[in-house]
Amino acid sequence: MVILKKKRKNFSQNTVLRNNVKKIGSVGKPFDICFLPTQLKIAKEFAKECDQMDLVLNHCGVPPIASGEIDEWSKDIKSLSELPNVTCKLSGLMAYCAPGTSSYETIKPYVDHSLECFGPDRMVWGSDYPVVNAGKGIQEWIKVTHTILGNLSDDEAKKIASFNAERIYKI
């Protein structure tokens, strides 16, 4: 697995980087991407150019949960989900909550929107381990995950929990 965590505004627009990412895709490997919510339009450009490979958007596109600003993120996630080569990773959301507010109820609108846009066939679960332990910990994230997946059919839950990751990462 290879991950692009975008720090500089124009880093992912670098031609050499994009060509190297395409080489990763040419051998059947997926590529994880992590963009800030203000960079999701750039993520879409990146995904369009790398359309012959699987890209996995980490942390549901890093929604601005702490601020509660859902509108722009929602539009951009919807737009990004229109590209069939992009999968959304359900991970790390508790880290984006305001201090003391990380809970299922807090992340639910963002999870629901991600599921609505990508559907259970294009979502994968991630533990965000060991970073998750800086917050409420892996046990709490697993508990929240069980609540999220408990709202889905068994087949949908299995896809998100493991089957999609097995398919995309070929594990």
Residue ranges, per PLM feature:
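Active-site gating/metal-coordination segments in enzymes
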Residues: 1-38, 45, 89, 93, ...
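C-terminal helical cap
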Residues: 92-96, 100-109, 158-169
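Mid-to-C-terminal alpha-helical segments outside catalytic/metal-binding sites
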Residues: 113, 117-124, 133-171
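Aromatic-lined glycan-binding groove of carbohydrate-active enzymes
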Residues: 71-93
